[in-house]
């Protein structure tokens, strides 16, 4: 009997599962205004919906249940604010749009977790700066210095401990982990080099699949590359190859985003003269049996396979039965070009 009741409950839940969720907005000082909700798909921004407010400034936003991520709400093409979408029905109230901090969001656990997370992050980074300054000043007083070092370690873990404390089903957990890492990496390069190794662990713990609708992928791969290229030379390429493996594997079920990330990362690696990592990424994608590359990706990556060190370049047909190899000239100038080159 218990099994039958459980089955009926599961069937009922499936029947009444929501396909869409709504956000009820009220901006009393902006009646008859146009609203646009924009989300992300990989690197691309896309319009999720458009709507208008009535004469009282009230409006309704509807978003699909399968869109889990961030979105930007634009009003009249100008004012915007960050929203989190994860199968929640909630309300917005904004009396004065010139005061972003005054926007009230009720009924969203995602947004509440985000606000607390950003507050924790800002407080921790501010305290960290002070403690990092004090530690070397007390080099002659080891007892006091150890007190500051211990406090420094505690403060350094404040934000990550908060993120880890969030429930697994809160999507903003992944967003905060990624956004925090993006914000911290440049500071670690410039001011806190001792913190850099922990960022490698944090990067490898990120769920890339969960970032599909985050709008953070571009900043993440660029920031991590910028961080790692400042490691000792013998560590740079192993760390980059490890990161490339992670991204390619985690996006194997989404070839469009996989190629988008790979193309951008490849170009970024080349622009930073990290050619060995660029070659590794190119060959990884070309040998990826789970993904059919589009023309742009194939053209971009093939240059490393065809022009790899040790390969013999193909002879060039110059017409009239003449080839480059047959020319007896002492000097030969060969200019290469391709239709995909800008």
Regions found by a protein language model. Give the residues of each.
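TPR/TPR-like (Sel1-like) alpha-helical repeat modules
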Residues: 281-289
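Charged, long alpha-helical assembly modules
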Residues: 178-257
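Structural signature of alpha-solenoid helical repeat junctions
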Residues: 171-175, 253, 257-260, 273, ...
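Short active-site neighborhood of thiol/selenol oxidoreductases, capturing the structured segment around
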Residues: 322-342
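Helix-turn-helix repeat elements of alpha-solenoid scaffolds
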Residues: 150-156, 234-242, 273-277
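N-terminal "domain-start" segment that seeds a small globular fold
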Residues: 290-325
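A non-transmembrane, solvent-exposed segment enriched in polar/low-complexity residues
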Residues: 18-203, 207-209
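Bacterial Sec-dependent N-terminal signal peptides
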Residues: 1-26
């Amino acid at each position: 009997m218990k099994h039958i009741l459980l089955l009926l409950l599961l069937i009922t839940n499936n029947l009444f599962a929501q396909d869409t969720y709504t956000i009820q907005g009220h901006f009393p000082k902006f009646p008859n205004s146009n609203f646009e909700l924009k989300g992300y798909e990989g690197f691309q921004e896309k319009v999720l919906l458009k709507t208008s407010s009535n004469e009282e400034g009230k409006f309704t936003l509807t978003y699909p249940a399968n869109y889990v991520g961030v979105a930007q709400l634009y009003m009249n093409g100008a004012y915007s604010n960050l929203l989190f979408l994860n199968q929640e029905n909630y309300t917005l109230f904004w009396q004065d749009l010139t005061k972003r901090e005054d926007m009230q969001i009720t009924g969203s656990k995602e947004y509440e977790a985000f606000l607390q997370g950003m507050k924790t992050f800002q407080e921790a980074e501010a305290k960290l700066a002070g403690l990092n300054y004090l530690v070397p000043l007390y080099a002659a007083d080891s007892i006091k210095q150890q007190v500051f070092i211990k406090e420094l370690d505690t403060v350094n873990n404040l934000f990550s401990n908060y993120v880890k404390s969030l429930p697994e089903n809160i999507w903003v957990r992944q967003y905060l982990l990624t956004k925090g890492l993006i914000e911290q990496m440049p500071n670690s390069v410039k001011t806190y080099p001792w913190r850099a190794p922990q960022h490698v662990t944090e990067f490898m713990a990120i769920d890339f699949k969960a970032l599909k609708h985050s709008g953070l992928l571009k900043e993440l791969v660029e920031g991590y590359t910028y961080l790692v290229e400042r490691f000792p030379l013998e560590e740079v390429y192993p760390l980059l190859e490890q990161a490339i493996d992670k991204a390619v594997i985690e996006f194997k079920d989404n070839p469009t985003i996989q190629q988008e990330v790979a193309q951008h990362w490849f170009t970024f690696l080349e622009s930073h003269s990290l050619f060995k990592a660029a070659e590794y990424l190119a060959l990884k994608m070309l040998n990826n049996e789970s993904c059919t590359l589009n023309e742009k990706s194939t053209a971009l990556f093939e240059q490393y396979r065809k022009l790899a060190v040790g390969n013999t370049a193909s002879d060039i047909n110059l017409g009239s039965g003449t080839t480059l190899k047959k020319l007896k000239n002492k000097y030969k100038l060969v200019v290469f070009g391709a239709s995909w080159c800008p």
